[in-house]
Amino acid sequence: VVETGAVLKASEDLNDYQYISELAKRGHDHMVEVPTFVNCEYDGKPRQYFIYSRDTDGVRISGGGVIDGSEEIYYGEVREDQIDGAFYPRIPLILMEHCTHLTIQNVTIRKSGFWTTHLVGCEEVEISGVRILNNRMMANCDGIDPDHCKNERISNCHIGAADDCI
């Protein structure tokens, strides 16, 4: 629970993020196609997240507060019309894999440097009353990315992102 008035802020020190060895072994999820990056050592497979859960039941993110992704640490060149976000790997905010009865409700999620909410193979998902406020000049800061989910309902959300909103 992120209570009203509270801000859960992602660390600006990349060493603070747990390296998820299971993601490294799988690359990511076998169901997800990863992007290709030219002239970059990064292979497009995120291995660290700010908030991560796998194979859990009843996860709930709620409370009226703010989750802040600290996007500024990923800025590459800032131009008038775009931030290139050339720093890789950028840490996505939330990954839920194969979770059931997942609820994300009445929170504001802002300043994601990459994917904001990535749900992979989840079932019985309720997302409502969520505000996603990403910098519209930051590439790939998708709002909500459901991959192979079942019985998912997204309602009453406001999503501002430079890439896919849903």
Predicted regions mapped to residue ranges:
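Extracellular/periplasmic carbohydrate-active domains that bind, remodel
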Residues: V1-I166
